[in-house]
């Protein structure tokens, strides 16, 4: 289409010489399409680390270099390098995992990791504590079941999410297939991954190696998700690009509302950074998914800020250019969007226990606290995997669904859940069932405080407060991270906690119950006593002053406890 866009400032985007942009842009451009010197670094047995630039490039391969931060000082005193190890993330569109793949992933975690698996808030697996010499065998093991880690991290399209709601089995299957199609389309095309990890020989070609991404890929990560109302389990408003399924009168997917510009990360004491909820800009039919996805990503690729990585996410491009300009830019590439169609969300939580989908199948959602599966849990779930004829689904809330259990097979699965004790995992408080935490310490290099290891104990103490006020059955969303980057999406929780220092957190209140509204900072840099004292006061008021069926986040705004956040850019006011 002819370019009819009004002029815009392009002083920080891909049109500029590399020397004017972030050093990461030169790194990508000079990496030979993500090859770098990764293959050579893997052969170096003198160090358990990889060379500096390759650390960043390996993220595009789904790999993060980390170290055990709790023994870092001691190793320094002993004149030893840090205890380096790697986190490896699988690409798993829609969180769908066959039983064969589950068993292989469990095997690899025990053989090459620390005998645990982490299910993430983006419906995939992470291996932790993988040593450098074990990366290749682990990745080749994944390849045996046709899984990989391509673009699970890095400046590209991350894993594509999709609703896990078996109440609409045909729609869910269609949505999962569309998510897989989009995921396959936006994955980087370079053969670097196959050459480095599978030993594939490089073959010269006259075709462009990255026809969409080019040499410098995206300015920052780009997240895509699909959702079927009324359950906003994937937190559609936290996605860079979200597709909200609209169901037609015939009961099939008529198309999608398009939501753009969501994102959770911020930096403390940096008011130019903030979380943002996505804006709905229109409606498209299913046949336009690929062209619109390319258009949206292409606008961010071409106009995103590549000079300042703290402002490189799509949310900032939208706010800098203006939503109307961005929509024009998308339509200039993909054609006009129709007006958005009505939809309604009621919750972003999982539905635990058995659900019958009406097509002869049953589905059991199992609570996995903070997504962490230890060796005992892996062994118990393996017993189910060996007999289960359906598949597994990883939920966006870090839980596990045993999906597509035939009526005739349900008694056997139920018996195994009881014999192994797994079924008791669901016997938790409503607050705990609605909680999430990121990994944080001791491995995440960005964490400033504990999260996964600390939240369970903190919840136990908050449960006492809820019981005191007879609120133990109230669904309240609580999310914690070890830093403000927001991996567990804390900025749309009714209660959000983000780490500031060991034992210290920022406390946020006022998020929307189904993820539709950002929360706001209420108390800054406080420890556990102040957290509990503050929540005791606010929950006490909620118990006595709330309206019928009023959610906690809504109450804190109506009662004047916290000011509503209407736009992310105003959340730091």
Swiss-Prot record:
What SUPFAM superfamilies would the database entry show? Nitrite and sulphite reductase 4Fe-4S domain-like (SSF56014), Nitrite/Sulfite reductase N-terminal domain-like (SSF55124)
Q: How is the cofactor bound?
A: Binds 1 siroheme per subunit.
Q: Name one GO cellular component term.
A: sulfite reductase complex (NADPH)
Residues annotated for [4Fe-4S] cluster binding in this entry? 438, 444, 483, 487
Q: What is its EC number?
A: 1.8.1.2
- Which cofactors are named for this entry? siroheme; [4Fe-4S] cluster
Reactions this protein catalyses: hydrogen sulfide + 3 NADP(+) + 3 H2O = sulfite + 3 NADPH + 4 H(+)
Q: In which pathway does it act?
A: Sulfur metabolism; hydrogen sulfide biosynthesis; hydrogen sulfide from sulfite (NADPH route): step 1/1
Top-rank taxon, per record: Bacteria
Q: What class of enzyme is it?
A: oxidoreductase
Q: Name one GO molecular function term.
A: NADP binding
State where siroheme binds. 487
Biological process, per Gene Ontology = cysteine biosynthetic process; hydrogen sulfide biosynthetic process; sulfate assimilation
Family to which the UniProt record says this protein belongs: Belongs to the nitrite and sulfite reductase 4Fe-4S domain family.
Function, as annotated, reads: Component of the sulfite reductase complex that catalyzes the 6-electron reduction of sulfite to sulfide. This is one of several activities required for the biosynthesis of L-cysteine from sulfate.
- UniProt protein name: Sulfite reductase [NADPH] hemoprotein beta-component
């Amino acid at each position: 289409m002819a370019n009819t866009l009004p002029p815009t400032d392009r002083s920080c985007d891909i049109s500029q010489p590399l020397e004017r942009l972030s050093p990461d842009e030169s790194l990508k451009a000079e990496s030979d399409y993500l090859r770098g010197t990764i293959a050579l670094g893997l052969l170096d047995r003198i160090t358990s680390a990889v060379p500096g630039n390759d650390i960043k490039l390996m993220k595009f391969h789904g790999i993060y270099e980390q170290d055990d931060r709790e023994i870092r000082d001691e190793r320094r005193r002993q004149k030893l390098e840090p205890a380096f190890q790697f986190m490896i993330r699988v690409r798993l569109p829609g969180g769908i995992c066959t039983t064969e793949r589950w068993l292989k992933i469990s095997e690899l975690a025990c053989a090459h990791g620390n005998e645990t698996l982490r299910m993430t808030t983006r419906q995939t697996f992470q291996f932790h504590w993988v040593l450098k010499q074990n990366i290749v065998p682990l990745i080749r093991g994944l390849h045996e079941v046709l899984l990989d880690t391509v673009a699970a991290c890095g400046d590209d399209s991350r894993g594509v999410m999709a609703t896990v709601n078996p109440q609409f089995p045909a729609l869910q299957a269609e949505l999962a297939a569309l998510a897989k199609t989009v995921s396959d389309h936006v994955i980087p095309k370079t053969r670097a991954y196959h050459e480095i990890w599978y030993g594939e020989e490089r073959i010269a070609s006259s075709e462009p190696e990255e026809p969409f991404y080019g040499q410098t890929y995206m300015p920052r990560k780009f997240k895509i998700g699909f959702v079927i109302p009324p359950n906003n389990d994937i937190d559609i408003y936290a996605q860079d690009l979200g597709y909200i399924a609209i169901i037609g009168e015939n009961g099939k997917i008529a198309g999608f509302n398009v939501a753009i510009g969501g994102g959770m990360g911020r930096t403390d004491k940096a008011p130019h950074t903030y979380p943002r909820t996505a804006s709905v800009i229109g409606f498209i039919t299913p046949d336009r998914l690929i062209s619109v996805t390319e258009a949206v990503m292409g606008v961010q690729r071409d106009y995103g800020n590549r000079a300042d990585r703290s402002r490189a996410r799509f949310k900032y491009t939208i706010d800098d250019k203006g939503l109307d300009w961005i929509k024009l830019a998308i339509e200039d590439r993909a054609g006009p969007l129709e007006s958005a169609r009505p939809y309604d969300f009621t919750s972003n939580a999982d539905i635990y226990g058995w659900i019958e989908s009406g097509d002869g199948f049953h589905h059991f959602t199992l609570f996995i606290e903070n997504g962490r599966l230890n060796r005992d849990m892996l062994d118990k779930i393996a017993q189910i995997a060996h007999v289960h004829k359906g598949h597994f689904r990883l939920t966006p809330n870090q839980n596990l669904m045993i999906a597509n259990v035939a009526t005739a097979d349900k008694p056997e699965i139920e018996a195994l859940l009881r014999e192994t004790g797994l079924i008791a995992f669901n016997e938790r408080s409503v607050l705990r069932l609605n909680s999430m935490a990121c990994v944080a310490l001791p491995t995440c290099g960005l964490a400033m405080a504990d999260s996964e290891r600390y939240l369970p104990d903190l919840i136990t103490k908050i449960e006492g407060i809820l019981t005191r006020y007879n609120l133990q059955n109230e669904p309240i969303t609580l999310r914690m991270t070890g830093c403000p980057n927001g991996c567990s999406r804390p900025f749309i929780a009714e209660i959000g906690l983000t780490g500031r220092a060991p034992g210290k957190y920022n406390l946020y209140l006022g998020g929307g119950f189904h993820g539709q509204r950002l929360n706001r900072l209420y108390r800054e840099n406080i420890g556990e006593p102040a957290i509990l004292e503050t929540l005791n006061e606010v929950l006490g008021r909620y118990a006595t002053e709330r309206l019928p069926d009023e959610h906690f986040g809504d109450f804190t705004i109506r009662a004047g406890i916290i000011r509503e956040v209407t736009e992310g850019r105003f959340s730091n006011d």
